[in-house]
UniProtKB/Swiss-Prot annotation:
The gene is moaA. [4Fe-4S] cluster 1 binds at residues 24, 28, 31. It comes from Bacillus anthracis (strain CDC 684 / NRRL 3495). Gene3D superfamilies: Aldolase class I. [4Fe-4S] cluster 2 binds at residues 261, 264, 278. This is GTP 3',8-cyclase. Binds 2 [4Fe-4S] clusters. Binds 1 [4Fe-4S] cluster coordinated with 3 cysteines and an exchangeable S-adenosyl-L-methionine and 1 [4Fe-4S] cluster coordinated with 3 cysteines and the GTP-derived substrate. Its cofactor is [4Fe-4S] cluster. Catalyzes the cyclization of GTP to (8S)-3',8-cyclo-7,8-dihydroguanosine 5'-triphosphate.
Length: 338
């Protein structure tokens, strides 16, 4: 019988997102703006981030508590040296049923074959525009679109399942919604639109910059009619729509206008080993200290279970009602991978 660990709102622990680095080769303005994360920014030193042994150990502990799906994140996870070896090790952990990776795609062409051989079956690529100048601006002048598209193609050629994530910001890239939808419909990859969220502390988020799920769907539906379809599984964050008369689909992740806190089953481990129970958390619990002490697996398991049992995060549900309250500092998305 599979273990089930529930929080105070009866949400099970099923998914673990593991950040393997806090570094990124992009400077996307909603995530790691150049003016904050510049040449003098102090990233974690190698001795501060979890080793592969520690990541494998913590994975086994979370699996014993009910986790079945892993997602490797960053920063940009493909900057972590030897990542295919980690994927291979995690793929052998008894109880792990699925491993995914989120990447900006700029290094994917190089690593796709080794990642697939290691057991990585699916990848999510962040891509906010197909327009060259706009994409270059949005990523902090770090990469051209073609480099990312070549990475997507390389992943497809080795057999990976691919999803594309587009963060939509009013006044920045909402004019690219239709072009993105058409392109990835033709290329048979699922495109997911993400409402611009108030993650971290430095992106200057304002509600007026959010393009809502309904606006996105209406815009596409006028040109390529859509119909809503059922979720693949309980707790899926994206609302799914298929193109009428086609097998292709899109998804919309609506953390702002139609939150899904009630079904959130995700825990997040930062690169230095802190456990966060919400994407918008203001503080985490230090598991690295336990991993590097004389704590046994059983003792760490008890600590993690207690943290999850006491979880009652529902930030997105409360966002608008708390809009006039003083904002608490939040963990940076670049630190825990979204």
């Amino acid at each position: 019988m599979k273990s089930v660990t529930l929080d105070k709102l009866q949400r099970p622990l099923k998914d673990l997102r593991i950040s393997v680095t806090d570094r990124c080769n992009f400077r996307c303005r909603y995530c790691m703006p150049e003016e904050i994360f510049g040449p003098d920014y102090s990233f974690l030193s190698n001795d501060k981030i979890l080793s592969f042994d520690e990541i494998e150990r913590i994975t086994r502990i979370f699996v014993s508590l009910g986790v079945r799906k892993l997602r490797i994140t960053g920063g940009e996870p493909l900057l972590r040296r030897g990542l295919p070896q980690l994927i291979e090790r995690l793929n052998k952990v008894d109880g792990v049923e699925d491993i995914g990776l989120t990447t900006n795609g700029s290094l994917l062409k190089k690593f796709a074959p080794d990642l697939y051989k290691a057991g990585l079956s699916r990848v999510t690529v962040s891509l906010d525009s197909l327009e060259e100048e706009r994409f270059f601006y949005l990523n902090g002048n770090r990469s051209k679109v073609q480099r990312v598209l070549e990475g997507i193609q390389a992943a497809a050629e080795v057999g990976m399942k691919i999803k594309i994530n587009m963060v939509v910001q009013k006044g920045k890239n909402e004019q690219d919604i239709l072009q993105m939808a058409q392109y990835f419909k033709e290329n048979k990859h699922i495109l997911r639109f993400i409402e611009y969220m108030d993650v971290g502390n430095y992106n200057g988020w304002e509600l007026k910059e959010v393009v809502s799920k309904q606006e996105i769907v209406d815009m596409i539906h006028q040109v390529m009619p859509l119909e809503r379809i059922e979720a693949n599984y309980a707790g899926e964050v994206a609302t799914r729509y298929s193109y009428i008369g086609s097998d292709e689909e899109i998804g919309v992740i609506s953390s702002v206008t139609d939150s899904f806190c009630s079904s959130c089953t995700r825990a997040r481990i930062s690169a230095e080993g802190k456990l966060y129970t919400c994407l918008f958390a203001s503080k985490g619990n230090d598991l690295r200290e336990l991993l590097r002490s004389d704590y046994t697996d059983e003792e760490i398991t008890d600590v993690v279970r207690d943290i999850w049992n006491n979880r009652e995060d529902r930030y997105s549900d409360e966002r608008l009602s708390n809009s006039n309250k003083k904002a608490m500092p939040k963990i940076e998305m670049s630190h825990i991978g979204g």
